[in-house]
Amino acid sequence: MEDNKHWIEKLFPPHFTVQDFFSQSFEPEQLISEKISKEKVKNVEKMYHNAAERCLEAGKWKRKEELSNIFSYDPNIPDDQKEKEPPVGNLHDNVTCPIAAHVDDQCIWRENELKVLRHEMQQRYSEGAKFKNQLDACKLELSELKAKDKNTEQELGKAKEALTLSKTHIRNKGILVKQLQKDKLQKDSEIQSLKKDLHEKSVMINSLNKNLCIAGEEIQELKLKSKDLEQELITVKQQQGVKEGTLIENLKRNYILEKNKLLREIENLKEEERKREKTHSLNLAALDLLRKHFSSQSINTSTEVIQLKIVH
C-alpha cells in the first residue's frame, strides 16, 4: 500500500505529531537566526580561548623569566633590584648569614656541610622549576589539545549535520528515483500502446492507399468514359442543332402562312365592318326621314310608331 503512495506524500506525510519529531532519524534544520547566534557564540568562544592561550603564554614566559632570575644569581645586580626579585642563592645566603656569623657559638652544621645543603637545595629548586615548566608546557599543550578537540568536535558536528542532510537528500532522491521508475513504467506502457496504435494506423493507411490506387484507376476509366460521353454529347448537340434548324424553318414558314391567313381574315372582318357601318348609317338616315315624315302627326302617335320601329 505504501508503494502506491506518491513520493511527495512520502516526503511530506499529511499527519505529523510530536512523537514523529522525536523519533525521526535526522536532525531538523536550524533556523537562520539560530545558526547566526551559534556562529556568534563560536566566535566569542574562539576569542576567549585565544585570549586564554595568550595569557598562558605570557604567564609561561613570565615564570620562565622569574626562574631564570632566581637561578642565575649575579652579584653585580643593584640592591634595589635584589629587594624586588631576590635570587634563591641570595635568599639562602641571607638565611644562613647569621648562622655563618655565629657558627662557632650556635650552629651545629659546618660550613662545608652548609654549602652542600645549599647546593642540594638549589638543585631541588631547579628541578622543581624544571618540573613546573614541564607542567606548564603540558598544561599549555593540554589546552591546545582541548581546543583542537573542541574544533574537532565542532567539525564532527558539522560533518554529522552534513551527513544527516546528505542522507535526507539521498532518501529524497531515492523516493524521487522510485517515482521516476514508476513514471518510466507508465510511459513505457503508453509507448507500447502508441506503437500498437501506430501499427494499426499504418495498416489502415496501407489499406487506404490500396483503395486510393483502385479509386484512381476507376477515376481514369471514368475520365475516359466522360470523354466518350462528351464526344457523343457534341454529336447529339450537332444533330439536335440540325433538327432545331429544320424545325425553326418549318415554324417560320407556318408562322408566315398563319400570319397571312390572319391578315386576310382581318381584312375580311374590316370589310364586313365597313359594310355594317354603311348599313347602319343608311338606317340612321332612313330613321331621320321617318321622323321628319311623321312630325306633322300627333306627338303620341308618332312617338308610339317610332318606338315600335325602334323595337322591331
Swiss-Prot record:
Residues 126-281 form a coiled coil. Keywords: Coiled coil. The keyword Coiled coil applies. Belongs to the CCDC160 family. This is Coiled-coil domain-containing protein 160 homolog.
